[in-house]
From Swiss-Prot:
UniProt name for this protein: Ribonuclease P protein component
Pfam families cross-referenced by the UniProt entry: Ribonuclease_P
Family, as annotated: Belongs to the RnpA family.
Keyword line: Endonuclease, Hydrolase, Nuclease, RNA-binding, tRNA processing
Position of the signal peptide: none
Subunit structure: Consists of a catalytic RNA component (M1 or rnpB) and a protein subunit.
Its job: RNaseP catalyzes the removal of the 5'-leader sequence from pre-tRNA to produce the mature 5'-terminus. It can also cleave other RNA substrates such as 4.5S RNA. The protein component plays an auxiliary but essential role in vivo by binding to the 5'-leader sequence and broadening the substrate specificity of the ribozyme.
One of the record's GO molecular function terms: ribonuclease P activity
Enzyme class: hydrolase
GO process annotations (BP): tRNA 5'-leader removal
Alphabetical list of Gene3D superfamilies matching this protein: 3.30.230.10
Catalytic activity field: Endonucleolytic cleavage of RNA, removing 5'-extranucleotides from tRNA precursor
Organism, scientific name: Streptococcus mutans serotype c (strain ATCC 700610 / UA159)
Amino acid sequence: MKKAYRVKSDKDFQAIFTEGRSVANRKFVVYSLEKDQSHYRVGLSVGKRLGNAVVRNAIKRKLRHVLMELGPYLGTQDFVVIARKGVEELDYSTMKKNLVHVLKLAKLYQEGSIREKEI
């Protein structure tokens, strides 16, 4: 995933948390904030309670890969995905299904309307 598609600064994270809205399911929480930009930006958060650094990094790698696949279906908002307990046990396809579900609830996933892929 290109750096232009990532939320990195603490200021951006705090703006999304304070000004944005949140949606959750059993495995993920998504905070989103509408922005006037040409593509989405995403921040990932995986807490220490999910496991050691190896486990947390594996979760983040899977999430980044799922988000790269879903990129053409995502809007132009900034959003943060927070992994909840139990996500470390999910395989790739189940993780993708759960993430698509919560992104649909947040109205970030636009099924059927594919933007031109920029990733």
